[in-house]
Regions:
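C-terminal binding/interaction regions
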Residues: 94-128
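Glycine-rich phosphate-binding loop
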Residues: 63-100, 104
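Glycine-rich phosphate/diphosphate-binding loop of Rossmann-like nucleotide-binding domains
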Residues: 8-53
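Active-site rim loops that border cofactor/substrate pockets in soluble metabolic enzymes
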Residues: 43-70
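Short, well-ordered secondary-structure micro-motifs
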Residues: 31-33, 61-65, 86-90, 123-126
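Short, ordered loop/turn segments at secondary-structure junctions
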Residues: 24-25, 54, 79-81, 115-121
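Short beta-strand segments at enzyme active-site cores
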Residues: 51, 73-78, 110-117
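Short gly/ser/thr-rich secondary-structure transition/capping motifs
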Residues: 1-5
Length: 128
């Protein structure tokens, strides 16, 4: 998927309780993702969001669920998983994606999907 054609939205998020759940792996990349999410929220009028740090992508769904249970109106999930030499990449990416989808559907609360699943660190840097 390319960033070309991304929608230009005018959103008022000033009254929303927003939780950003972000992984702790590859902070050189996730810090950039987090900064971008913070800029977008501030542009939408929200400066009272909460940041929830988790170890890795596998923990994103549970953190999203807990954030919703704590009152979040919307969750933004951020992280990066970089392909290695084992199938671990596939398991983590699938589990995180399916888990976030399940939480979103079970709770009826939107979850912005900002989990980069890439082949190389450079791809992640280019997308962050």
């Amino acid at each position: 998927m390319s960033g070309a054609g991304a929608p230009k939205l005018n959103i008022d998020a000033s009254d929303l309780q927003v939780a950003i759940v972000v992984t702790s792996w590859h902070t050189n990349i996730t810090d950039g993702l987090l900064a971008g999410a913070e800029r977008a929220l501030k542009a939408a009028g929200n400066e009272t969001y909460e940041i929830w740090r988790v170890p890795g992508a596998f923990e994103l769904p549970l953190a999203a669920q807990k954030a919703i249970e704590a009152g979040a109106d919307v969750v933004v999930a951020l992280g990066v998983v970089i392909q290695g030499d084992t199938p671990h990449f596939d398991y983590v990416c699938s589990s995180a994606t399916e888990g976030l989808t399940r939480v979103q559907l079970d709770y009826g609360v939107p979850i912005g999907f900002g989990l980069l699943t890439v082949n190389t660190e450079q791809q992640a840097l280019d997308r962050a």
